[in-house]
Amino acid sequence: MKHSQPRGLSRRRVEHLLSETKNDRSTGNRVDVLSRHFLGHSYKPNPLIGSADTAEVFTASLDGFDCVTYIETILALARAVNVDDFIEWLRKIRYAEGRIEWARRNHYMTLWIRNNVRTGIIRPVSMPAVPMLIRDRVLNVVPGLAAQRARVKCVPKPAVPRLAAYLQSGDLIFFVSTAKNLDVFHAGIIVRAGKSMLMRHASRSQGLVVEQELSEFLKANRMTGVMVMRPQGVPGRIAVSNQVRGLSMRRIRCAQRSDGAKRRGGK
């Protein structure tokens, strides 16, 4: 059974994107190809709809992103075989247990990572020869959300160049904040280009989805360190949940508004 058409989302556009990678069984390659497609698209601050006192609306936009919705969209496309799969994977990636509620949204990236590791969508990249740092944080930057304790394990900034031996195109990189009340301040997708290590990301400062040298971003930004995750699995159908099947067109909207700065803003 097909979903109701999300307002503003062209099924043909999603189908075209999926057709470009349908014969590639490597999730990393699919992430690489799909993330390239959106270079030059607009950065959209606060792209999600919902708050502590506003009903959550499940949104799916291919027109503009913050750093997190860019990654979520690419991951969902990379795992999907059709439009309904794309919508379902996006729901599972964005919300704890796939439940479309503001309180269940993965507001902080440590939670986002933990829940997506648990469901087998991503896994940590093994880097046995790279030093790791552990920092405890109390996360409290989202209005209306109770403070959460988080333990952040990351590669310290000075050691990031040593990651070159381990990273692959399609890996996800998360930049750990120096603030004691925030875990991650930005995220992107790694691309290997010969000896160069590039990153694709929705850049707030440039107003676009861009590709740049990872070293340039590291030089320009203060951070404690980075975390790296690798997308898992191959494309496959996913059972359509009753929650999404029953959503009206009012509840699924392709939107270009509300939630980015509160929800770990992009650089």
Where are these regions (language model features)?
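Cysteine-nucleophile amide-bond enzymes
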Residues: 1-267
